[in-house]
Amino acid sequence: MASQGTKRSYEQMETGGERQNATEIRASVGRMVGGIGRFYIQMCTELKLSDYEGRLIQNSITIERMVLSAFDERRNKYLEEHPSAGKDPKKTGGPIYRRRDGKWMRELILYDKEEIRRIWRQANNGEDATAGLTHLMIWHSNLNDATYQRTRALVRTGMDPRMCSLMQGSTLPRRSGAAGAAVKGVGTMVLELIRMIKRGINDRNFWRGENGRRTRIAYERMCNILKGKFQTAAQRAMMDQVRESRNPGNAEIEDLIFLARSALILRGSVAHKSCLPACVYGLAVASGYDFEREGYSLVGIDPFRLLQNSQVFSLIRPNENPAHKSQLVWMACHSAAFEDLRVSSFIRGTRVVPRGQLSTRGVQIASNENMETMDSSTLELRSRYWAIRTRSGGNTNQQRASAGQISVQPTFSVQRNLPFERATIMAAFTGNTEGRTSDMRTEIIRMMENASPEDVSFQGRGVFELSDEKATNPIVPSFDMSNEGSYFFGDSAEEYDN
C-alpha cells in the first residue's frame, strides 16, 4: 500500500496500540497471546480438565465463547432488560467434553460471567485486554469462513453467490474494532451496508432523530472502511458518492453491488492473520514459553512454528475423515479459506482439496448429537513451508489498478499467476453504465477489461523453509495452472446460521 505511512500495522490495530516499532509490536502481540494462554490454563484448572481434554479443540472453543460472551456488554445489557425464559443473563457456559471409561461424554457447564471476567483480567495483568478478545473473535470468524458457505446471505441482499470469495469475516461481531475491520472482505462490507440501506428504505425513522444521527455516523464510517479497501481511484470515487448520498436507497445498493463485482478482478486490500485456538497458546505458556519476551507476530513465521510443536485433538463423528478435519482447521488457523488451493497445498505440503470434496462437517458439535459414537483424533496442523501473510489483495507488480486474483483472496504473499476466465466475470457487467456514477463505472470496466490472466501476482515472492526464520531464501513455487484454484468449487458446505 502506498499510504503505508498513515496506516497502523494490523498488529497495532490488534493490540490497540499507537505507532510502535517492530520490536514493540512483537512484544505487545506476544503479551496479548500470552494472556490468552494464561487464561486458558487457568480455565482448565477450574474445570479440572486432563491434559488430553485441555487439548481438545471443542473444549477450547467453548472456553473462548464463554469469555467472549462474558465481555459482550451490549448483549449482557439486552439480556438484563429483556429477560427470556430459562436464560440467566449473569451466567455463561457451554459443552465441555470429558473422557470417561474410554468414551467421550458431554457435560454442560455454567459459570458466572463476573467470575470469567475476573479470571481473564487476572491472566492479563488486571486489564480488560480487548485485543485478546478480538483475536479470539477473528479465530472464530476464520473457522466459520472455512466451514460454512454464505450463499443464502449473498442472495438475500441481491448479490451473486459467485462473490463468495469476497466474504471474509462475514460472521465477525460488530464490536470487533479496527482489527476486525481490517480482515473483513469487500463483500462483507457491502453486505453490511446494503442491510443498513434496506432498513432505511423500510423504516422511515431509521435516519431521523438522535438515533438516526448515530446511524448516519456508523454508515459513513463503514463506507470509509470499504473505501480504504479499494485500490483504484474510480472505485474510491464511487464509494465517496455512496457515502455522501443524502438519502441512501436503491441507487446506492446498485452501486455497491457493482463495486463488489468489480472487486472480483480489481481486488480489495484485506488483511490476513493467523489466529490460533486458545488451547495452542495455553500449551506454549504451560511449557514455559514467554511470548512477551520472545515477541510474536500474526503474519510471519511464529504461528507456523507454534503449530509445528502443538498437538491438538478433535472429536470426530463416525463417518468423518480425520485428514479432512485437519485441513479445515489448518485453513482456519492461517485464515486461508479464500486462498488459491495450489498455493495452500504447496505451503502445507499435502494436497488441500475444495470444500465440496471434504468428508467432514463443522468442528463444533450440536447439543443433540449422539456422543456414544464419537471418537477423537489428532489434528495435523503442521506445514512444509511458511509464507508471509498479505494485506494487499495480490495486485500485480505494484500497479495499484491491475488485476488481483480472481475467485480467491490471497492470504500468502507468494508469486502466482491469475487463474481466471475474464469472459465469465465480464458477463456479470452487462449494460448498466447510466446514472451519476456512469463515468466511474466505465472507467472501472475499462480497467477490468485490460486485466490479463497472464499477469503475475506478488512477483518474486516465495515460501520459506521453516528453518529460515529471517526469510532470506525465498523459494518461488511453480504451479500447475490447469487446476481449479478455488476452495468453493463444487461447494457442499452447510449454510452459516447464527
Swiss-Prot record:
GO terms classed as biological process: symbiont entry into host cell; viral penetration into host nucleus
Predominant subcellular localization, coarse grouping: virion
UniProt keyword list: Capsid protein, Helical capsid protein, Host nucleus, Host-virus interaction, Ribonucleoprotein, RNA-binding, Viral nucleoprotein, Viral penetration into host nucleus, Virion, Virus entry into host cell
Annotated motif Bipartite nuclear localization signal, positions: 198-216
GO MF term set: RNA binding; structural molecule activity
Gene Ontology cellular component list: helical viral capsid; host cell; host cell nucleus; ribonucleoprotein complex; viral nucleocapsid
Pfam family, one: Flu_NP
Domain of life of the source: Viruses
Transmembrane segments: none
Function text: Encapsidates the negative strand viral RNA, protecting it from nucleases. The encapsidated genomic RNA is termed the ribonucleoprotein (RNP) and serves as template for transcription and replication. The RNP needs to be localized in the host nucleus to start an infectious cycle, but is too large to diffuse through the nuclear pore complex. NP comprises at least 2 nuclear localization signals that are responsible for the active RNP import into the nucleus through cellular importin alpha/beta pathway.
Family under the similarity heading: Belongs to the influenza viruses nucleoprotein family.
Descriptive protein name: Nucleoprotein
Provenance organism: Influenza A virus (strain A/Ruddy Turnstone/New Jersey/47/1985 H4N6)
